[in-house]
């Protein structure tokens, strides 16, 4: 019954002559559209747009929204995504007219409040990272990676160096090698050792006078803090290369340690993961980057600077804020105007709300929750990298697949029937049948216990029940291969007319 109840498209709900609003009689002279445009600019037939009442449209989209899982409706343990609950006050404050209605072409004199906020946020990002140079221009995490690697390229170019290789870990996010390629570098992969950490011998073998950057995620995507970081730091820097820290997992170390303190030269933040930027929806996002002093002049601009007013009458006009280029050596703009400020405003509110001590509690609670889950899950799923983790952990369904024909994908599909979003599966690639779980700091012990109970029950269920799951969703298991090879990307009516 479930699969027969597919949601109808607006085009299928359409009825000829139905309208959302009706216009009054024309009280101005009518105009013939044919006389206003050239023949080639006019369509021969009207587009087959849906004809619907407003209520029909609202019910359609609200109905679709109820089919989705979200952080606001379900526990969302999607590993490597930090799907934490974000306070709604951040959304309300970011929507204040003074933030929402500014125009990027306004003169700086009319943007002083916003520029002051951005200036303070630059300082916060610098303090959290231990890296003083900050640009908030990039529009997402991967964009931040690209911008930072372009900074590294500019640095080596000015040094007269022909270093053109970026090393990435085999457990890294796929954006790492992709960003390196886009920045004009060649890439080599550094293997993990049996403990899930960087294989130092492989790193030594691949470091040479062509190595520009080693891109490291720490904690890594296995949820492990690399205890070899001091040795990694020495090896890379002794080879004349830079260390890039993928800040995707900063939620595990806020206020506990700083990338700059353990050797990173460049890094990016993911505000949508760590600092209450909205997840999903295609953006907008932000990917602020932080660098050491000697790299700051290459940062993309503009950045916000502050000038003290000599004739200030009080604190309200003590400073003036300006958008400026970091230097003549800047790599230039990587984003129009001054970045996606709406996301940055949310990050500022989040950081001001928690403060330094509060951020440390965020990470401590995130790590505590992940270790609590790991201590339970290890009794019925294999955990290949020990009994301790940081903010997330990776289990394996390999044994279950062999003994019970229960795969990681089966677990992910069946858990939906229990009212939980699926964990990440089959990533990172270094773990067979990977099940990656990240609970975040915003979930209660009761929620974590219920999730563990659901996972355990799934491992005890029959094959047929699991292989046909999910049973409670509108669509069960789509044919992924056919969808990829023969996608239907536009609506076509019975006569073959499309809406595009």
UniProtKB/Swiss-Prot annotation:
Its EC number is 1.4.4.2. It catalyses: N(6)-[(R)-lipoyl]-L-lysyl-[glycine-cleavage complex H protein] + glycine + H(+) = N(6)-[(R)-S(8)-aminomethyldihydrolipoyl]-L-lysyl-[glycine-cleavage complex H protein] + CO2. The keyword Metal-binding does not apply. GO terms for cellular component: cytosol; glycine cleavage complex. GO terms for biological process: glycine decarboxylation via glycine cleavage system. Gene3D superfamilies: 6.20.440.10, Aspartate Aminotransferase, domain 1, Type I PLP-dependent aspartate aminotransferase-like (Major domain). InterPro entries: Aminotrans_V_dom (IPR000192), GcvPB (IPR023012), GDC-P_C (IPR049316), GDC_P (IPR020581), PyrdxlP-dep_Trfase (IPR015424), PyrdxlP-dep_Trfase_major (IPR015421), PyrdxlP-dep_Trfase_small (IPR015422). Its cofactor is pyridoxal 5'-phosphate. SUPFAM superfamilies: PLP-dependent transferases. Keywords: Oxidoreductase, Pyridoxal phosphate. It is an enzyme of class 1 (oxidoreductase). It holds the Pfam family Aminotran_5. GO terms for molecular function: glycine binding; glycine dehydrogenase (decarboxylating) activity; pyridoxal phosphate binding. Belongs to the GcvP family. C-terminal subunit subfamily. PANTHER family: GLYCINE DEHYDROGENASE (DECARBOXYLATING), MITOCHONDRIAL (PTHR11773:SF1), GLYCINE DEHYDROGENASE, DECARBOXYLATING (PTHR11773). The glycine cleavage system catalyzes the degradation of glycine. The P protein binds the alpha-amino group of glycine through its pyridoxal phosphate cofactor; CO(2) is released and the remaining methylamine moiety is then transferred to the lipoamide cofactor of the H protein. This is Probable glycine dehydrogenase (decarboxylating) subunit 2. The gene is gcvPB.
């Amino acid at each position: 019954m479930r699969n027969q109840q597919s949601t109808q498209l607006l085009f299928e709900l359409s009825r000829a002559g139905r309208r959302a609003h009706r216009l009054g009689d024309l009280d101005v002279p009518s105009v013939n559209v044919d006389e206003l445009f050239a023949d080639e600019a006019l369509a021969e037939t009207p587009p087959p747009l849906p004809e619907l009442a407003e209520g029909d449209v609202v019910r359609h989209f609200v109905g679709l929204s109820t089919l989705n899982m979200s952080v606001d409706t379900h526990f969302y343990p999607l590993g490597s995504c930090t799907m934490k609950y974000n306070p709604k006050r951040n959304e309300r404050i970011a929507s204040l007219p003074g933030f929402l209605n500014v125009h990027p072409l306004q003169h700086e004199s009319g943007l002083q409040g916003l520029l002051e906020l951005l200036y303070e946020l630059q300082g916060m990002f610098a303090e959290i990272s231990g890296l003083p140079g900050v640009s908030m221009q990039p529009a997402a995490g991967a964009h931040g990676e690209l911008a930072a690697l372009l900074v590294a390229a500019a640095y080596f170019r000015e040094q007269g160096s022909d270093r053109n290789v970026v090393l990435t870990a085999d457990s890294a996010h796929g954006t790492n090698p992709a960003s390196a390629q886009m920045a004009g570098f060649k890439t080599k992969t550094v293997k993990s050792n049996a403990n899930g950490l960087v294989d130092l011998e492989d790193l030594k073998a691949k470091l040479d006078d062509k190595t520009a950057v080693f891109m490291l995620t720490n904690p890594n995507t296995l949820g492990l803090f690399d205890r070899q970081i001091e040795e990694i730091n020495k090896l890379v820097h002794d080879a004349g290369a830079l260390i890039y820290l993928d800040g995707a997992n900063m939620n595990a170390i806020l206020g506990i340690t700083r990338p700059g303190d353990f050797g990173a030269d460049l890094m990016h933040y993911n505000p949508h993961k760590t600092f209450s930027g909205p997840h999903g929806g295609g953006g907008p996002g932000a990917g602020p980057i932080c660098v050491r002093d000697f790299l700051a002049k290459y940062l993309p601009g503009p950045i916000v600077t502050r000038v003290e007013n000599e004739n200030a009458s009080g604190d309200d006009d003590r400073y003036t804020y300006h958008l400026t280029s970091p230097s003549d050596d800047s790599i230039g703009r990587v984003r129009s105007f001054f970045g996606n400020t709406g996301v940055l405003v949310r990050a500022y509110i989040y950081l001001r709300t928690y403060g330094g001590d509060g951020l440390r509690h965020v990470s401590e609670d995130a790590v505590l929750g992940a270790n609590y889950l790991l201590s339970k899950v290890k009794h019925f799923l294999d955990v290949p990298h020990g009994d301790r983790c940081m903010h997330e952990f990776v289990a394996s369904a390999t044994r279950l697949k062999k003994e019970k024909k229960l795969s990681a994908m089966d677990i992910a599909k069946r858990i939906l029937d229990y009212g939980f979003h699926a964990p990440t599966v089959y990533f990172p690639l270094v773990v067979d049948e990977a099940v990656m779980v990240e609970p975040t700091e915003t979930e209660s012990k009761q929620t974590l216990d219920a999730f563990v109970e659901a996972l355990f029950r799934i491992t005890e269920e029959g094959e047929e029940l699991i292989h046909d799951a999910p049973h409670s969703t509108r669509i069960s298991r789509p044919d992924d291969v056919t969808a990829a090879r023969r996608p239907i990307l536009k609506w076509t009516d019975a006569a073959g007319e499309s809406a595009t």
